[in-house]
Amino acid sequence: PNTVIYNCSECHKRFRSKSGFVKHQKTHTGETPFVCFVCEQRFVCHSALIGHQRIHTGEKPFSCTECGKCFSRRSHLNSHHKTHTGEKSFLCFACGKCFASRSHLTAHHRTH
């Protein structure tokens, strides 16, 4: 397939979408045009601001179809869903043990 790849000239990361590439470039320029009206924290993209504002509002629009638990971010729901499926896709290359989240794998790495 003829997939266009966008290359960052600063750090050489590669992106398949132009929007992801443009958002990434702001990490190098320091541009943070989106500001939280409550705490004035700044963000590179609008979607990050929206997710952050849910901390202040308490809104949790993403609910688990298995148990009904609600989350403020879709990524948190996706991580939670693994507790129901048993999926463990993060592998420790040192010992072969698998984990459901990158953070659990990172914590495990400290034991080696």
UniProtKB/Swiss-Prot annotation:
One of its GO terms (biological process) is regulation of transcription by RNA polymerase II. Transmembrane segments: none annotated. PANTHER family: ZINC FINGER AND SCAN DOMAIN-CONTAINING, ZINC FINGER PROTEIN OZF-LIKE. A zinc finger (C2H2-type) spans 6-28, 34-56, 62-84, 90-112. Coiled coil: none annotated. It comes from Xenopus laevis (African clawed frog). Belongs to the krueppel C2H2-type zinc-finger protein family. GO terms for molecular function: DNA-binding transcription factor activity, RNA polymerase II-specific; RNA polymerase II cis-regulatory region sequence-specific DNA binding; zinc ion binding. The keyword Transcription applies. Keywords: DNA-binding, Metal-binding, Nucleus, Repeat, Transcription, Transcription regulation, Zinc, Zinc-finger. GO terms for cellular component: nucleus. May be involved in transcriptional regulation. It is found in: Nucleus. This is Gastrula zinc finger protein XlCGF16.1.
